[in-house]
Amino acid sequence: MFDFLTSLQTYRQEAAQAAQYIGQGFGVTFDHMSRRPITIHYPYEKLIPSERFRGRIHFEFDKCIACEVCVRVCPINLPVVDWDYQKSVKKKQLRSYSIDFGVCIFCGNCVEYCPTNCLSMTEEYELSVYDRHELNFDHVALGRVPTSVVQDTLVTPVLGLGYLPKGELSSLP
């Protein structure tokens, strides 16, 4: 008789503990249901990157002195700098400069260590192409003026969406 009561008591404790775990799971689920969604409608809405965002590299050909510091500080020796030495003025003359964004890890070392500030990071993050060889940008493509998300009239700019705390659903537009 006592074995039956102890097994019944154990069963009740385990059932109560299981109900508690299920209640905790539902609590987390309902908590997340009241938060703002993280996803956006991409082609029609685009995120505005932060100021420190490291996107496509912009290159200014006229400022470059062909010192190759960018190549030396790059962890994968990525920038290809082609130059000629002019004996008359005893100076390097830059012929071409290219970066393959299919290999680039966007660490920003080249931008940080450039002595003439001819390299800068832009807020462009749409670099998708059908052929990976199109990701090899020469100095002409790198010198293209970066486009801003805010300037596009067909797109609704969205400020950065972080993981929002509780009660932020009511602030949706």
UniProtKB/Swiss-Prot annotation:
Catalyzed chemical reaction(s): a plastoquinone + NADH + (n+1) H(+)(in) = a plastoquinol + NAD(+) + n H(+)(out); a plastoquinone + NADPH + (n+1) H(+)(in) = a plastoquinol + NADP(+) + n H(+)(out)
Alphabetized InterPro entries for the sequence: 4Fe4S_Fe-S-bd (IPR017896), 4Fe4S_Fe_S_CS (IPR017900), NADH_quinone_OxRdtase_chainI (IPR010226), NDHI (IPR004497)
Record: residues binding [4Fe-4S] cluster 2: 74, 104, 107, 110
Annotated [4Fe-4S] cluster 1 binding sites: 64, 67, 70, 114
Family: Belongs to the complex I 23 kDa subunit family.
Annotated function: NDH shuttles electrons from NAD(P)H:plastoquinone, via FMN and iron-sulfur (Fe-S) centers, to quinones in the photosynthetic chain and possibly in a chloroplast respiratory chain. The immediate electron acceptor for the enzyme in this species is believed to be plastoquinone. Couples the redox reaction to proton translocation, and thus conserves the redox energy in a proton gradient.
SUBUNIT field: NDH is composed of at least 16 different subunits, 5 of which are encoded in the nucleus.
Record protein name field: NAD(P)H-quinone oxidoreductase subunit I, chloroplastic
Gene for this chain: ndhI
